[in-house]
Design a protein with these regions (language model features):
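Gly/Pro/Ser/Thr-rich low-complexity, intrinsically disordered segments predominantly at protein N-termini
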Residues: 1-227
């Protein structure tokens, strides 16, 4: 698979402390109790599998068999961006994909953290020409030196753009990312019900002042529509 799971130790959900309770508070037992479960010691290490969520566009062969990956769409998360716990793993996998001739589309909706590629202007650092959200499309064909990287930036009051993704033999597919986002949000009723337009999205302080004003205006219109 193009994305290899990362193994990690699970974080504790509960912290156990020690209370100074006199031993006389507990009834005495003359014999040690028998354990209710007995396993190998290695079972004490809880190792989980973590995978990156992504969408793969694959070739379909002439006999209707699913072929190799042509394009890979990745929704960036805090863990695979700069300074994240999965940054090294993700950088390795993206390099592997690009060297393999796979078109890579990266959706970065995290305005409060720098872009994954240092050549892209950074919104949180106040770089000129930076946008709070970006979609980058890297086509490494015929090779990385001759391939192209295209970055589509958009603001807080602009619809997510429609982008043409190159496939094989000159074929392209136009993907309307705004429609995908809206339909996904609407289909996840738990999220739509939790949307509180009386509150500004967080972290609101990481937006530029002019963008905070635009967000407040959009929120006000949404509040008037839903109330």
């Amino acid at each position: 698979d193009d994305i290899t799971p990362k193994r990690f130790l699970a974080k504790p959900d509960v912290t156990i402390g020690r209370l100074n309770i006199p031993s006389s508070s507990f009834p005495e037992q003359s014999l040690a109790v028998t354990p209710t479960i007995e396993l190998d010691a290695e079972e004490a290490i809880d190792i989980e599998e973590a995978t990156y969520g992504a969408v793969a566009i694959r070739q379909v062969t002439s006999n209707n068999q699913i072929g190799e990956v042509v394009a890979w769409l990745e929704l960036l998360s805090p863990s695979n961006k700069r300074g994240g716990s999965g940054e090294a793993q993700y950088q390795h996998k993206r390099t592997q994909a690009l060297h393999g001739g796979i078109v890579l589309i990266e959706l970065d909706y995290l305005h409060h953290s720098p872009p994954i590629m240092r050549r892209i202007p950074s919104y949180p650092d106040g770089d000129e020409g930076a946008y709070p959200y970006t979609i980058s499309l890297t086509d490494p064909r015929p090779n990385l030196k001759e391939g192209k990287l295209k970055v589509y930036g958009f603001g807080v009051d602009i619809a997510i753009p429609t982008i043409e993704i190159p496939l094989l033999n000159g074929d392209k597919i136009a993907v309307n990312f705004d429609t995908i986002y809206q339909r996904t949000f609407a289909s996840l009723r738990a999220y739509s019900l939790r949307a509180d337009y009386d509150q500004l999205p967080q972290p609101i302080g990481a937006y530029h002042p002019q963008d905070r004003e635009k967000i407040a205006q959009v929120n006000q219109r949404a509040h008037e529509t839903t109330s």
